[in-house]
Amino acid sequence: LEYVCVLTELGKVCGGFGLSVAAHNSLCIGHILQHGNEAQKNKYLPALASGEHIGAWGLTEPNTGSDAMRMQCVAKKEGNEWVINGLKTWITHALSADVYVILVRTGDLLDSNGISAFIIEKGTPGLSANKITQKVGVRASETAELYFDNVRVPAENLIGEEGKGFKQAMKVLDGGRISIAALSLGVAKGAYEASVAYAKEREQFGKPIAQFQAISFKLADMATECEAAELLCMQAADMKNKGMNIT
């Protein structure tokens, strides 16, 4: 519930910054917290939670967004390491992250048990990124393509069991949907507050336009929808806190 309130307030003033906070917490930290072992949690979470380190989470590829089981980024086991090759895109913090949680294919194409999650550290040889600059909005949130060229990852950086990454990702995204809903609520509330302020300032026919019924109706509708959205966000957050299914 507190997290929803924080993201809502951030969304009022800067959707891009709020999105960065959501990606860091809901996705990267959330994945390790929910599915990592104790050694992984102890190694990575303190610096991520304090803000000393920035986290990124990678699922999307150029031709696989919602259709994640068609991903082409592949990891092959070689001794005590996994070797990753491929490309991810639209990855928040891909350039600045210290820690990455990446979903890759370790089994057959279209097999939901053929995807695994790995923790990759900044500076790992073969890992590089290219910033995406042509964005319509949320430009304060860094977005980039992430390249893997024979990136070697220790076997202990596998999160959970091999082949369970897809199921892990779906659970992580459940919580992520609440954070994006809260962020969107903040954007809406910010727009509403700006609209009210302008309606009180702008004058026509000798009085503020807020006093005209047609304008008041629109503002009332906006306020009603914001209130309804806030209640739904809070309900979803409360259900998640109780361990209930929210999707």
Model-flagged regions — what are they?
Residues 1-52, 92-99, 111, 240:
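Internal helix-loop-helix
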